[in-house]
Amino acid sequence: MSRKLPNDLRSTTVLEAYRAHVTERAQENIPAKPLSASQVAELIELLKNPPAGESEFLLDLLSTRVPPGVDEAAYVKAGFLSAVAKGETPCSLISPEAAVELLGNMHGGYNIETLVGLLDDAQLAAAAAQQLKHTLLMFEAFHDVEALAKQGNSHAAAVMQSWADGEWFTDRDPVPEATKMVVFKVTGETNTDDLS
């Protein structure tokens, strides 16, 4: 039977363990592993009741150490941020607007349903549209945005126009005139697994 640690001690232990992991990996000149689904769940509990002096670190972990897309950790992150954006879960460190921005940084996957749904939200529609304008991994949700635009939703129409104009590309820094590279030549047959 495992003994549950008090919240202060548990949070310190979780953060200390992650910092130790970062230090260990840095000594090998490799980045820290992204957070797992269970680590993200623990992080969310800390975000709801942040230990003193850890707010910035917690926000950095949520924004930069959770893989985007459709892995289990991204699912947990998207669920939490969706609840914050919709006002279902209060979080003193993340406003609904900030939650929308963090959802947009996930680039597709579990964040899409919430962002598309927020196109109908009077307070957050503009923020959701801004994030969707730079999200390309929409899959079937493209049709949902299109349907909203056809129903007269101006935010959805703005997203569709942005995609048509390629703003996701034209808003980026220009492509450099020249790029220096190193070529790794392998004789015989190889695949990306060999390079991983």
Report the location of each language-model feature:
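Amphipathic alpha-helical packing elements
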Residues: 7-44, 49
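Charged, low-complexity interaction regions
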Residues: 30-34, 51-53, 70, 88-92
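Amphipathic alpha-helical scaffolding segments comprising HEAT/armadillo-like alpha-solenoid repeats
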Residues: 37-45, 68-87, 106-120, 137-149
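Residue-level signature of the C-terminal ends
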Residues: 50, 61-69, 102-109, 134-139, ...
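Alpha-helix N-cap/helix-start positions at coil->helix boundaries
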Residues: 52, 89-94, 109, 121-126
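Conserved hydrophobic register position within alpha-solenoid helical repeats
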Residues: 54-58, 95-102, 128-132, 156-160
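HEAT-repeat alpha-solenoid elements in large eukaryotic scaffold proteins
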Residues: 58-62, 89
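Fe-S-dependent hydro-lyases/dehydratases of central metabolism
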Residues: 130-196
